[in-house]
A protein has these predicted regions:
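A short, conserved structural fragment
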Residues: 70-83
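Short, cationic-aromatic polyanion-contact patches
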Residues: 27-31, 80-106
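Short acidic, hydrophobic short linear motifs in intrinsically disordered regions
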Residues: 43-56
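Short acidic DE-rich linear segments
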Residues: 131-146
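Short amphipathic alpha-helical interaction segments
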Residues: 56-72
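Short alpha-helical segments that sit at the start of domains
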Residues: 4-36
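Short, amphipathic alpha-helical interaction segments positioned at domain boundaries
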Residues: 95-129
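Short amphipathic alpha-helical elements of helix-turn-helix/winged-helix folds
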Residues: 37-44, 100
């Protein structure tokens, strides 16, 4: 069964996307471009370094993005190259990354709420922006149509 634009609109899938994206970026110390690139790569399942480079064309230039995402554990090697028969390594998003993306989808589908505990990095009332986001989270949780 193929989804249409009306089906997705009826789900209200993108209604709180910005808030959820900001939560994920702040909680997991990512920037917006990194998160969206990881979502793109997760959809590809397995990818090469060239696929990664192709995916970065629409994002801000960040020379260190590849190494940073690998060192932080967002990208894992699926198959190493062996210099004879396998000319390049193949990568996949890590378990940590796929869990984050699954959690984002669950929150977007209202199967799960954003955390509102005091331990949450995102829910601390330190700045004006934090208070605005906290109000938005409270409104999102109360929204019956999401």
């Amino acid at each position: 069964m193929k989804l249409s634009a009306i089906d997705i609109r009826d789900l209200n899938l993108l209604k709180y996307y910005r808030l959820i994206r900001k939560w994920a970026c702040k909680t997991y110390s990512l920037n917006d471009a990194d998160l969206e690139l990881l979502i793109y790569l997760d959809c590809k399942k397995r990818f090469t370094r060239n696929d990664f480079i192709d995916g970065t064309y629409t994002y801000s230039w960040d020379k260190n993005r590849w190494e940073r995402l690998r060192k932080q554990g967002w990208i894992d090697v699926w198959r190493h190259r062996n210099r004879t028969t396998i000319k390049y390594s193949i990568y996949k998003t890590s378990f940590k990354c796929s869990q984050l993306i699954s959690r984002i989808y669950r929150i977007m589908l209202a199967e799960e709420d954003l955390p509102t505990s005091e331990r949450s990095k995102f829910y601390k009332n330190k700045s004006y922006t934090d208070k605005v986001y906290n109000k938005a989270i409270d409104d999102m949780i109360k929204d019956k149509d999401r």
